[in-house]
Amino acid sequence: MSPTPAIDVRGVSKRFGTLTALDNVDLQVWRGELFGLLGPNGAGKSTLIGIISGLVRATGGSVAVLGHDTVQDFRTARRSLGVVPQELVFDPFFKVIDTLRLQAGYYGCGREAWPWIDELLERLELTDKRHATMRGLSGGMKRRVLIAQALVHRPPVVVLDEPTAGVDVELRRTLWAFARELHASGHTIVLTTHYLEEAEDLCSRVAIVDHGRIKVVSTTRELLARHPFRFLRVSLSGAPLPERFRPQAEACGDNEWELKLDRSTQPLGRVLEELRDAGCRIEDIATREPSLEDVFVELTEEAADVA
C-alpha cells in the first residue's frame, strides 16, 4: 500500500448548532482499496462525504485527498475526486451529452475528453440517450448519468454515495459490475450502501459509523471472524421451544426458529441435546455463519444500549 492514503481524515468534527453530526473522526482509505462506509440513517456518512468532497466545511479537523488538503489545496483535491451523490441532482433541460461535456469543462477538460465521455455512455448503456434531456429519463437512467458525471475528469478516487438507491435489481447488478471494473483499473472506490450483503462481497475493508463516530474499521474477514455468535435454524415438532432459548430465538415459521448461539458457551451438540431432553423432535436443522449484516446490527445495537 502507498504511504500516502487516498483519503486521509484526521480529527474531523461537524456540528450543526447543538447537533454533533461527526465527532473527532479519524479514517484512512488506502490507494487501490474498495472501501465500504456503512451505518444506519443519520449516522453521519453523507456529512463525512460532503466534507471530503468540499461541499461541507468541517467544524474541526482536516481531510486530504491523495495528500492534497481539501481546504488549503482544494482545486487539486477536487480534481482527484469524483462523487456520485445520493440525491438525483441535475438540470432538467440539458441533454445528456451536454451535461457530461459541461461537467468535464468544469475540470478544465475540453474536446480531448469527448472520446472518454463516449466510452462512459457506452459502458453505462446510455448511448441511445445521449441526445435526450435529463427530465425525460427514468430514475435509473438519471442515476447512470450522475455516475458518468463523476467520472468525466478521470478521477483516481471515486466516492459512490448510495449509488443503487431506488434502482431495480438489473441496474444494481450493472452498477456493481461497473464498480468492480473501475477498481480493477486502479481506481480507489469508497461506497456507502444499505445492501450489506453487497458490501460484504465487494469491499476488502469497511468502516461502521454510528452517532457520528467510527465504531470499527476492519477487513470484512476479520469482522466476521471475531463475531461471537453462530446461528442455528431448527424445525421442531412435539414439545415447543424451551423458554430458556426464547430470548435468543427468532420465529421463522410454525415452530421453526433461528437461534443465536454464543460460540464459547453454547456448543452445537449441547444445544441439540437440551432440545431433545425438553421433548423436542428435530425435523430439520441448518447452521450459518454470521454475515456482515449480523455484525452491523450487533455493533449499532451496542451503541444504542450505551446511549
Where are these regions (language model features)?
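Conserved ABC transporter NBD signature motif
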Residues: 61-72, 76-77
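Catalytic Walker B motif of ABC-type/P-loop ATPase nucleotide-binding domains
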Residues: 158-162
